[in-house]
Amino acid sequence: MSLLEQLDKNIAASGGLIVSCQPVPGSPLDKPEIVAAMALAAEQAGAVAVRIEGIDNLRVARSLVSVPIIGIIKRDLDESPVRITPFLDDVDALAQAGAAIIAVDGTARQRPVAVEALLARIHHHHLLAMADCSSVDDGLACQRLGADIIGTTMSGYTTPDTPEEPDLPLVKALHDAGCRVIAEGRYNSPALAAEAIRYGAWAVTVGSAITRLEHICGWYNDALKKAAS
C-alpha cells in the first residue's frame, strides 16, 4: 500500500486532522524534545500526520512517532520572500532526517530555486511532494509540475494584510479543479476545520490553535479584555 493510499484509509477512519507542531520561535516550548512530545501527543489523539519545521525537531520527532511527518525548513532570505524549503539542500536534509512528505513554497514569487526542481528532488528521494500555495493559479501550476498535494498554506500571507478567516473558497476551487487539498491557514476552531472538509479538503492542518500556547492565551486575553471594557 502506498503512503497516499494509507493516508486515504486513515483519513477516512479518523477525519483528516494534521497537527502542525511549530512553537513560536524563541518560546520556552521551542525545543526539539518538546516539539517531539507535541507530535507524539497529536498522534495519540488521532492526528493522521504532523507538520514539523527544522532538522533537529524532525529527527527527534521521527524517533517517537509512527505517523507521516510533513517536513519543512524555514529560512529568511535577503534576495527572496520565499521562506519554506527554498533550497535543494533543504530537501535532501529533510529526506535524510525522516520526512515522509516535504512541503515547499509553491507561490509564483522570486525564488532561489525553481519549484519544478524542488518537486523533482523530493520525488528523487521517493517521497511525497506538497506545494504550499496562495491561489488557484499557484495550485494548478504546482499540480502540473508534479506536486502530489496542494496546501492552501500561503493564502493571505503573500500580501500586507492577512484576513482573520481561512480561505475556504480556495479550498473548494482547488478541489473542484482536481487537486488533493490540505486546508491550512487560520483554521482556529473545530467548526472551521469541519467546514474545510465540507468544501472539499482532503485533510486539514491546524497549528496555532493546538500547539502555540502564546497565540491561544492571546486570544483569551483579548476576549476577556474586550468583555471587561
Curated annotation (Swiss-Prot):
Domain of life of the source: Bacteria
Keyword Nucleus assigned: no
UniProt catalytic activity: an N-acyl-D-glucosamine 6-phosphate = an N-acyl-D-mannosamine 6-phosphate
Listed EC numbers: 5.1.3.9
Pathway: Amino-sugar metabolism; N-acetylneuraminate degradation; D-fructose 6-phosphate from N-acetylneuraminate: step 3/5
Statement: the UniProt record of this protein carries the keyword NADP: no
Any single Gene Ontology cellular-component annotation: cytosol
Enzyme class: isomerase
A biological process term (GO) from this entry: N-acetylmannosamine catabolic process
SUPFAM superfamilies noted in UniProt: Ribulose-phoshate binding barrel (SSF51366)
Function as written in the Swiss-Prot or TrEMBL entry: Converts N-acetylmannosamine-6-phosphate (ManNAc-6-P) to N-acetylglucosamine-6-phosphate (GlcNAc-6-P).
PANTHER family given in the database record: N-ACETYLMANNOSAMINE-6-PHOSPHATE 2-EPIMERASE-RELATED
Family label: Belongs to the NanE family.
HAMAP family: ManNAc6P_epimer
Protein name: Putative N-acetylmannosamine-6-phosphate 2-epimerase
Species name: Salmonella paratyphi B (strain ATCC BAA-1250 / SPB7)
